[in-house]
Structure formats: C-alpha cells, structure tokens
C-alpha cells in the first residue's frame, strides 16, 4: 500500500532489497516450528500450542523446543494451578489483576521435569490439555509432583549435569 512512498526514503535507497523496517527482528523459519504461545497479559487460562502455522507478533511470548506432544505437556503444566500460583507470586499484576508471562518470571517457575514423568501419566496430561480439562490437568500435576518427589528420594544426587529441556525464546 505504501511501498512506493517507503522506497523513496534514504534507508530504502541505501539497501533496496530492505525497503521496509520493523521494530522486531523477523525470523521466517520460526513460523514453521512448533511452539507454545504465551500472551503477555490474558484472562484466559488456556495456553495455545502452535504446530507451526503461526508467527508470534507483539505482546506474545513463545517457548520452542521439542515435539508437539512435548509442548502440549509443558503447556498443560503451565496451565496448572501449581504453576499459576507460582506465577501469581512472582509477577506484578496488570490489566485487571492478571499476571504477566515475561521471561524473567517464566525462567523462575518450578516445572516438573518431563523426561521423568511416566508415559501413562504424560499421555493423560496431554489428553486433559486437548480436552481443555483444567481439573484433570491439576489432578495430573499433583500425581506428577508426587512421582517426581519419589524419583528424587530414590536418586537424591544426579551423577551428571542435566541439560535444559527447552530453549526459551521470548519476543
């Protein structure tokens, strides 16, 4: 619509192939990657997992890494009361008292390690996520936390340094 007018500017004349400018960097490959979308501020308790169809724009944070099923399990945990209570205690509240999903807060959240969750429980958690079943998610999260406690009681000290599960990329 305004391409001709923008092409007349100094920046466009200097590098004609980049006649446009954006505030945020654009990463075209990001659209195709599976990711979790976290709205900056929202009254909605549902967290969306994108299978690679959408590109996150302003006021949307995202977490990428792993397969779609892995991200659904993580999204379910992020929707749980266990994590929401942590977020409410960490963040400042905005716009009607809703917490913010900013990186400095998300990085402090205690989230169960997905790799030690029994497959049957993980499948149940994913099913609850797909059915928008918050009560089921909370029940699964409670069971996961009990299981995690038992695993760490049996193996109190990991023998090697554990690598992070995900790459947290925030826009």
Residue ranges: model-predicted function:
Residues 113-171:
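Non-catalytic DNA-recognition/assembly elements of restriction-modification systems
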Residues 1-123, 127:
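Polybasic, glycine- and aromatic-enriched phosphate-binding surface used to engage nucleic acids
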